[in-house]
């Protein structure tokens, strides 16, 4: 009798352990929209300071995504989850921004940064210029184009005199610098040039070469003959301006990145697909890449 009891207990234990093993092999993580919302809030928060490519916050997010892929058992496409490359990135040089109008009689008018003018982030080949009516100045209804020996510069009206907009950064853009101005500044520049004044401007940004990375993770499929399914989302955005305004980019593109991260987490639990699924978190989309 005792032997039978031991036998049945052992059999029961084996069945339970086998059931748990099978259950663990076939459990899956359903796609959770609440996780996506939470992730969007985190990625677009001040913690990541706008995720500008080349910034330390952007690098922190690279590592967060890499760890996420690794924790969910995705494998690198090559030897590393990160595919590194170099870009030219704007950096705040902490100089004092100014737009000054200097007249022949010695009078000088200083316009207010963030109220009368502000950089448009699209390019910073030059961030300090001086010009007058002796330079080539083309006037249009909503912008002023200035050509000097240092290059071409554009002063354009901010939509509705609102400086909250920030462009993507394009290093090979044809203008050396673009500056947002309001209607009063537009008129002051034109009137002062007619009066023979000299205009000087400094924008508190410069450029540096930075190494950044895309982050790639793969769910391996069972077939080597089928082409892979490639899913991408860019995780960078526009960073922080000199007034400490943070461009969080919840829709562009914390939302897409968060969706992709939740999707890979879910799909990684469904067992092997037929084809490889490659997840690519792209960097420097806001630099035109």
Q: Predicted regions: what is each one?
A:
Residues 43, 69, 87-95, 100-104, ...:
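Acidic/His- and Gly-rich active-site-bordering loop/insert found
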Residues 49-144:
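Noncatalytic luminal/extracellular "stalk/propeptide" segments of secretory-pathway proteins
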Residues 4-76, 165, 219-221:
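N-terminal hydrophobic or amphipathic helices/low-complexity stretches enriched
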Residues 26-30, 46-57, 71, 75, ...:
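Second-shell loop/turn segments in exported
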Residues 167-249, 269-270, 274:
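Soluble metallo-hydrolase cores and metallopeptidase-like ectodomains found primarily
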Residues 46, 131-134, 156-160, 182-183, ...:
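Active-site-proximal beta-strand/loop segments in catalytic clefts of secreted hydrolases
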Residues 211-214, 244-289:
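Acidic/histidine-rich catalytic neighborhood of metal-dependent amide-processing enzymes
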Residues 33-40, 62, 66, 186-187, ...:
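Extracytoplasmic/secreted envelope proteins and their assembly/folding machinery
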């Amino acid at each position: 009798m005792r032997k039978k009891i031991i036998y049945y207990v052992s059999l029961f234990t084996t069945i339970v352990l086998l059931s748990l093993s099978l259950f663990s092999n076939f459990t899956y993580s359903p796609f959770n929209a609440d996780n996506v919302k939470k992730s969007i809030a985190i990625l677009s928060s001040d913690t990541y300071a706008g995720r500008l490519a080349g910034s330390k916050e952007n690098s922190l997010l690279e590592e967060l995504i890499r760890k996420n892929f690794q924790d969910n058992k995705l494998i690198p496409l090559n030897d590393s989850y990160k595919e590194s490359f170099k870009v030219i990135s704007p950096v705040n040089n902490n100089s004092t921004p100014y737009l000054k109008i200097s007249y022949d009689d010695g009078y000088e008018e200083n316009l207010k940064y963030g109220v009368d003018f502000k950089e448009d982030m699209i390019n910073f080949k030059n961030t300090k210029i001086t010009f007058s009516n002796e330079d080539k100045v083309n006037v249009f209804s909503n912008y002023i184009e200035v050509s000097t020996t240092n290059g071409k510069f554009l002063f354009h009206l901010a939509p509705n005199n609102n400086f909250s907009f920030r462009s993507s950064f394009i290093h090979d853009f044809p203008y050396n610098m673009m500056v947002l101005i309001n209607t009063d500044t537009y008129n002051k520049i034109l009137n002062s040039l007619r009066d023979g004044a000299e205009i000087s401007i400094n924008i508190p940004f410069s450029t540096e070469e930075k190494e950044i990375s895309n982050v790639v993770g793969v769910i391996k499929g069972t077939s080597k003959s089928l082409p892979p399914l490639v899913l991408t989302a860019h995780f960078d955005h526009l960073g922080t301006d000199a007034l400490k305004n943070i461009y969080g980019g919840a829709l562009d593109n914390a939302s897409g990145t968060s969706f992709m991260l939740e999707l890979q987490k879910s799909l990684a639990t469904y067992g092997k697909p037929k084809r490889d699924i490659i997840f690519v978190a792209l960097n420097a989309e806001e630099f035109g890449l």
